């Protein structure tokens, strides 16, 4: 019997995001919160560059449900604070970025850095520590090349570390490439994806749909990991992806 959509794997283009993941930087198994593509409109055509999946520690579900249970998927999608609560919540997160089109590490890190710095400056929190963290971040990516199917993994600890890992074929790496101890950077990387100016509205909507269903059915993250879960509305979309 297949898993209900709110805890099932998600396919974005030809890339599958498993229902659970255990990345470098944590001893815990995380559940898939949602996934979607990132792209841009170029000459009237939507061009997809990456597929993005956001995973959450099991404790994230009851933690978020205290405030957000009872809200519809539409309400969650439109709520800036809901996504801030995911970004800043006291639980571990994993963000996986898989390339649909080839990209150099320099191209990727420069764009992420630009978004992070813009967020910090708008919040009045850009200082020497953040500047040095960005330098380290760019150094980690400086000699990387990402062909289609290659993945970047960011494990974000609530204690402030950002663990960065790479995989050329999309499988989960066993060893981290770098760890940067800077909580604002760890949060800003995820903020740049699902925040108010996040680069993947598809991933945001997928998160809202799946989490609202988990809240509604009183499902905890541990049940999602073990498969002891049933979701009332099994017709909900697994994500918003183009065929």
Curated annotation (Swiss-Prot):
SUPFAM superfamilies, sorted: Chalcone isomerase
Family listed: Belongs to the chalcone isomerase family.
Catalytic activity, as annotated: a chalcone = a flavanone
EC number assigned by the record: 5.5.1.6
Protein encoded by which gene: CHI
Binding site for substrate: 50, 115, 192
UniProt record, GO biological process: flavonoid biosynthetic process
Annotated function: Catalyzes the intramolecular cyclization of bicyclic chalcones into tricyclic (S)-flavanones. Responsible for the isomerization of 4,2',4',6'-tetrahydroxychalcone (also termed chalcone) into naringenin.
Keywords: Flavonoid biosynthesis, Isomerase
GO terms assigned for molecular function: chalcone isomerase activity
Note: Part of the biosynthetic pathway for all classes of flavonoids, a large class of secondary plant metabolites, many of which are brightly colored.
Designated name of the protein: Chalcone--flavanone isomerase
Site for Important for catalytic activity, residues: 108
Pathway(s) the chain acts in: Secondary metabolite biosynthesis; flavonoid biosynthesis
Taxonomic superkingdom: Eukaryota
InterPro entries, sorted: CFI (IPR044164), Chalcone_isomerase (IPR016087), Chalcone_isomerase_3-sand (IPR016088), Chalcone_isomerase_bundle_sf (IPR016089), Chalcone_isomerase_sf (IPR036298)
Transmembrane segment boundaries: none
């Amino acid at each position: 019997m297949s898993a209900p959509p709110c805890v099932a794997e998600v396919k974005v283009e030809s890339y599958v995001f498993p229902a659970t993941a255990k990345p470098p930087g944590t001893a815990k198994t995380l559940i898939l919160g949602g996934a979607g593509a990132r792209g841009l409109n170029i000459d009237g055509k939507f061009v997809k560059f990456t597929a993005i999946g956001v995973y959450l520690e099991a404790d994230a579900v009851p933690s978020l449900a205290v405030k957000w249970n009872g809200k519809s998927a539409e309400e969650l999608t439109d709520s800036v604070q809901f996504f801030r609560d995911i970004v800043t919540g006291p639980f571990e997160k994993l963000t996986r970025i898989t390339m649909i089109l080839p990209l150099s590490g320099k191209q990727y890190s420069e764009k992420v850095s630009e978004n992070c710095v813009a967020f910090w400056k708008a919040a009045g929190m850009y200082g020497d520590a953040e500047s040095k963290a960005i330098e380290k971040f760019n150094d980690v990516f400086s000699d990387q090349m990402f062909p289609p199917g290659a993945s970047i993994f960011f494990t974000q600890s609530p204690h402030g570390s950002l663990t960065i890992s790479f995989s050329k074929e999309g499988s989960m790496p066993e060893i981290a490439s770098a760890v940067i101890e800077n909580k604002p950077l760890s949060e800003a990387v995820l903020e740049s994806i699902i925040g108010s100016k996040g680069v993947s509205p598809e991933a945001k909507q997928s998160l809202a749909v799946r989490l609202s269903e988990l809240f509604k059915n009183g499902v905890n993250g541990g049940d999602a990991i073990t498969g002891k879960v049933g979701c009332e509305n099994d017709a909900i979309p697994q994500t918003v992806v183009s065929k």
